Amino acid sequence: MERIVTPAEMFEDGNSELSLRPQKINEYIGQDKVKERLNIFIKAARNRKEALDHVLLYGPPGLGKTTLANIIAKEMTGDLKITSGPAIERAGDLAAILTTLKDYDVLFIDEIHRLNRSVEEILYPAMEDYALDIVIGKGAAAKSIRLDLPKFTLIGATTRIGMLTSPLRDRFGVLCAMEYYDETQLKEIVIRSAAVFGCKITEEGALEIASRSRGTPRIANRLLKRVRDYSEVKSNKVISLKEARDALELLEVDNQGFDKVDNKILEAIIDNFNGGPVGIETLSYFIGEELGTIEDVYEPYLLQKGFIVRTPRGRIASDKAYKHLGRVNNKNNNSNKGQTSFFK
């Protein structure tokens, strides 16, 4: 069963995300620095009747990269074609996509860091010269033919910018870091989404959902749908603070946006390992979750929020973790020191 607070896209998100997506850049909530830069670059490109420079969007999942790509395509009056790194297995697959593009179209490649090298090399002349180099024949008889491509924009999206090769990364003219949303921005998103869904919600109810959404619009919209279900069954015409809080408690999403496993990890470190340090393999065995799942799914948000600290000796629970669980930290260790980045 998938976690309701996962930032990754779930099957149920598909149709609702399409209906909730803003269509213009001025309708897009949050990411103000990214919006301002893109707005200027888009207007400049349109004035010169040129394609927008290739754009790389990087940051955690669920923050609106696909939505931004859709907006850019509309602002440039082009069509959006969506694919992903894992879906493009051979160079011929990418060549087939590139040859269907028209001027000002946008090609969006999600998880672009997962492109294999032979496919990636096809992109180099396509991005630099709007050209596609095709080799015909084999051996001594082989010859290369260059096909002209339309003036398109490539938008790459990645959650792991460090995994991109330098030649690919350097070919993007615009790099945009997507950041987590604050509660005020998420509250606006929840209120807007509620209007699209046709349900009424108070500002307090929207803020309660926003505060448990882990800084991620995708999670906020998913929680709103479940709170709406709860409110309708309880015959409440408006989602108030009480309805939102009761529904989220039923879903076992606490006031930090943590679910059962998040809290289980904190409890294990504090109650069973005296606050740490504890090795990730030991922790994995103790809570019954795969090591990779802890590192990729659960740990990043706990690190980002400062509830655990990663050190060379293992994971340590911070003072925030003790306070969150209502425990007293009697251990004389400085839990605020250590490696807090989950990108290393």
Curated annotation (Swiss-Prot):
GO cellular component: cytoplasm; Holliday junction resolvase complex
Enzyme nomenclature, EC number: 3.6.4.-
Record flagged with keyword Iron: no
Segments for region (Small ATPAse domain (RuvB-S)): 182-252
Principal place of residence: cytoplasm
Annotated segments matching region Large ATPase domain (RuvB-L): 1-181
Reaction(s) this enzyme catalyzes, per UniProt: ATP + H2O = ADP + phosphate + H(+)
Biological process per Gene Ontology, one example term: DNA repair
SMART domains (alphabetical): AAA (SM00382)
Subcellular localization, as worded in the UniProt entry: Cytoplasm
Binding site for Mg(2+): 66
Keywords assigned by UniProt, alphabetized: ATP-binding, Cytoplasm, DNA damage, DNA recombination, DNA repair, DNA-binding, Hydrolase, Nucleotide-binding
InterPro entries: AAA+_ATPase, AAA_lid_4, DNA_helicase_Holl-junc_RuvB, P-loop_NTPase, RuvB-like_N, RuvB_C, WH-like_DNA-bd_sf, WH_DNA-bd_sf
Residues annotated as binding DNA: 310, 315
Pfam family, any one: RuvB_C
GO molecular function, one term: ATP binding
UniProt subunit comment: Homohexamer. Forms an RuvA(8)-RuvB(12)-Holliday junction (HJ) complex. HJ DNA is sandwiched between 2 RuvA tetramers; dsDNA enters through RuvA and exits via RuvB. An RuvB hexamer assembles on each DNA strand where it exits the tetramer. Each RuvB hexamer is contacted by two RuvA subunits (via domain III) on 2 adjacent RuvB subunits; this complex drives branch migration. In the full resolvosome a probable DNA-RuvA(4)-RuvB(12)-RuvC(2) complex forms which resolves the HJ.
Domain notes: Has 3 domains, the large (RuvB-L) and small ATPase (RuvB-S) domains and the C-terminal head (RuvB-H) domain. The head domain binds DNA, while the ATPase domains jointly bind ATP, ADP or are empty depending on the state of the subunit in the translocation cycle. During a single DNA translocation step the structure of each domain remains the same, but their relative positions change.
PANTHER family documented for this protein: HOLLIDAY JUNCTION BRANCH MIGRATION COMPLEX SUBUNIT RUVB, PTHR42848
Biological function: The RuvA-RuvB-RuvC complex processes Holliday junction (HJ) DNA during genetic recombination and DNA repair, while the RuvA-RuvB complex plays an important role in the rescue of blocked DNA replication forks via replication fork reversal (RFR). RuvA specifically binds to HJ cruciform DNA, conferring on it an open structure. The RuvB hexamer acts as an ATP-dependent pump, pulling dsDNA into and through the RuvAB complex. RuvB forms 2 homohexamers on either side of HJ DNA bound by 1 or 2 RuvA tetramers; 4 subunits per hexamer contact DNA at a time.
UniProt family annotation: Belongs to the RuvB family.
Protein name (record): Holliday junction branch migration complex subunit RuvB
Name of the encoding gene: ruvB
